[in-house]
Amino acid sequence: MKLINLVPVFFVLIIVVDYCHSLPFFLLSLIPSAISAIKKIGKRSVESQRYVDLNRRDLEQDLQELQDFLDQISEH
């Protein structure tokens, strides 16, 4: 076989070996982002924060006063 016929095979082997060599490093770089994504699953989103977080902003009492006021109005 002539050497010129082996050049495409040689280039394909270089590409395959380079890809296989860099794949573990690519997967290792994905681990921190996957961990942070898993940690964010249990956290509340910003959109629901203002509705869920009444106790922290001390709005529970205001909500109760509003509910009492609405009850008084509905009685009349």
From Swiss-Prot:
Tissue: Expressed by the venom gland.
GO biological process, one term: killing of cells of another organism
Region forming the signal peptide: 1-22
Propeptide: 42-76
Subcellular location as annotated: Secreted; Target cell membrane
Main location per the UniProt record: secreted
Keywords on record: Amidation, Antibiotic, Antimicrobial, Cleavage on pair of basic residues, Cytolysis, Fungicide, Membrane, Secreted, Signal, Target cell membrane, Target membrane
Function: Antimicrobial peptide with potent activity against Gram-positive bacteria S.aureus (MIC=2.5 uM) and S.agalactiaea (MIC=2.5 uM), and Gram-negative bacteria E.coli (MIC=24 uM) and P.aeruginosa (MIC=2.5 uM), as well as against yeasts Candida albicans (MIC=6.25 uM) and C.glabrata (MIC>50 uM). Also elicits high hemolysis on human erythrocytes (HC(50)=9.2 uM).
Family: Belongs to the non-disulfide-bridged peptide (NDBP) superfamily. Short antimicrobial peptide (group 4) family.
Protein name: VpAmp1.0
Lineage: Eukaryota, Metazoa, Ecdysozoa, Arthropoda, Chelicerata
